[in-house]
């Protein structure tokens, strides 16, 4: 045995020379792994050790697995069986280390967790969520290990088929409903335990495959319905037969209303119209209706608005001057009128109470001829009578007399320069005589109530019966009959 030990000495020395290098590399690898992966806080027993001596010597002396692995590696390299070297004493613990510290160090090293990176980890859970499909969308086919999809042939019809889902969780009731075009979407207020399937109205081009899926979740897939489509509004307690009966009763009531009127579907006449027709009918077939002017009904309303007791007096006062002037013209044979030159009828007939532009009445003028009617008032330069309205009714301002502070005698016709006709010159173009006013001629701020033309467009005419007959204007007795005729 001693010979064997002596003969094996050189090899052991070589192995011992090579072994420290391997041990050093293994120890460095372990040190790097422990320092990078999980940093440890040294215990109280470990503080007495020197770091290089601990990490280099303890793995070789404490771990028998590393020794066996190194022996196998040496034997494979040298081709000789592993031999226990005599230089193991060099790797022995120093005398100052106690066995308790060694055991605590072993426990600390053994408790170091090493993180293993698993790249081939299987996917734990795959969430299955229903897809919202449009009627014209193409559904791709996927082969998944979770559920088996049964492929069935598609039957395209004007009313699309509805997918039937076989669910192990909830039982689905199949109930065919006839949905009308004016249906409303049902409202569900209770938790859904049993889902009723209702047919959807889909366009003829849409086709949905029928397939059965084993659902892992409690959710039931829903399809999006266009907003234009509405479904009947009913609760779960109501059956589809009740909805049909309600629709049939509504249609029956509508049909009875139409039959009551007649087959022509004409709405029934109102009772008020029938009562009016009965009043109009009398014995003998004679009908009577109130006579109301259709085109000028506002005249009747205006006449009703006027006080009935004073209506005759107001009308007589308004047209009394016309009557007096007409009768006097027939007696004297001189017809005095105020009109536009091309008119065949006079806008106003001039009488003794008519006022001239100079501010004096017609009776204060002297009629010499049809072209010379001067004023007889002293210091008046008027050479020809020129009619101007002296009452507000003659210019269409009827409402002025209703004012409490209105004085009819103080009313005067005004120019557009806001001065009266008496403040203008009586001859020529009638310029304004007011101090500081540069109005060259009188321009009325009113219109004629008979023809809606301005005062300066009218003229005053003195004519005989022969002149009016030649001009085809009314004269004599015709003057009384035609004085109210329009132009």
UniProtKB/Swiss-Prot annotation:
Family annotation (InterPro entries): Fam221a/b
Composition bias type Basic and acidic residues, residue spans: 227-236, 243-253
Ranges where the record places region Disordered: 1-103, 132-289
Keywords: Phosphoprotein
One Pfam family it belongs to: FAM221
Sequence positions bearing Phosphoserine: 248
Domain of life where this protein originates: Eukaryota
Biased composition range(s): Polar residues: 1-13, 36-48
Signal peptide (residue range): none
Compositionally biased intervals (Low complexity): 81-103
Assigned protein family: Belongs to the FAM221 family.
The protein's name in its UniProt record: Protein FAM221B
Organism: Mus musculus (Mouse)
């Amino acid at each position: 045995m001693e010979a064997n030990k002596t003969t094996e000495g050189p090899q052991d020395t070589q192995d011992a020379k090579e072994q420290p290098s391997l041990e050093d590399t293994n120890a460095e690898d372990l040190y790097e792994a422990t320092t990078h992966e999980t940093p440890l806080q040294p215990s109280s027993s470990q503080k007495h050790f020197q770091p290089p001596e601990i990490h280099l010597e303890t793995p070789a002396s404490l771990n028998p697995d590393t020794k066996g692995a190194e022996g196998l590696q040496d034997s494979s390299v040298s081709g000789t069986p592993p031999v226990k070297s005599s230089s193991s004493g060099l790797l022995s613990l120093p005398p100052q280390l106690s066995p308790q510290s060694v055991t605590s160090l072993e426990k600390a090293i053994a408790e170091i967790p090493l993180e293993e990176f698993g790249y081939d980890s299987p996917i734990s859970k795959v969430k299955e969520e229903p897809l919202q499909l449009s009627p014209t969308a193409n559904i791709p086919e996927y082969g998944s290990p979770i559920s088996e999809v049964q492929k069935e042939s598609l039957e395209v019809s004007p009313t699309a088929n509805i997918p039937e889902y076989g669910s192990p969780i909830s039982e689905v009731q199949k109930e065919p409903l006839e949905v009308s075009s004016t249906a409303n979407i049902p409202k569900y207020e209770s938790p859904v335990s049993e889902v009723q399937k209702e047919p959807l109205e889909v366009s003829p081009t849409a086709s949905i495959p029928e397939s059965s899926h084993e659902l892992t979740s409690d959710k039931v897939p829903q399809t999006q319905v266009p907003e234009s489509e509405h479904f009947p509004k009913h609760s779960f307690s109501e059956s589809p037969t009740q909805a049909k009966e309600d629709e049939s009763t509504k249609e029956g009531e509508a049909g009875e209303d139409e039959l009551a009127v007649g087959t022509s579907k004409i709405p029934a006449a109102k009772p008020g119209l029938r009562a009016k027709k009965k009043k109009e009918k009398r014995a003998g077939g004679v009908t009577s209706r109130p006579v109301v002017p259709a085109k000028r009904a506002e005249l009747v309303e205006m006449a009703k608005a006027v006080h009935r007791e004073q209506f005759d007096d107001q009308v007589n006062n308004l047209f009394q001057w016309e009557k007096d002037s007409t009768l006097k013209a027939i007696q004297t044979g001189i017809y005095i009128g105020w009109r536009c030159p091309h008119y065949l009828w006079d806008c106003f007939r001039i009488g003794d109470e008519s006022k001239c532009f100079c501010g004096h009445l017609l009776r204060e003028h002297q009629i010499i001829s049809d072209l010379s009617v001067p004023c007889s008032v002293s210091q008046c330069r008027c050479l020809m009578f020129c009619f101007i309205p002296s009452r507000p009714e003659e210019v269409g301002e009827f409402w002025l007399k209703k004012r409490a502070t209105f004085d009819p005698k103080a009313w005067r016709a005004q120019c557009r320069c806001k001065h009266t006709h008496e403040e203008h010159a009586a001859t020529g173009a009638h310029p304004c005589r007011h101090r500081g006013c540069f109005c060259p001629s009188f321009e009325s701020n009113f219109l004629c109530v008979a023809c809606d033309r301005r005062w300066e467009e009218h003229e005053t005419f003195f004519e005989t019966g022969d002149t009016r007959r030649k001009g085809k204007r009314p004269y004599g007795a015709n003057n009384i009959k035609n004085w109210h005729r329009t132009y």
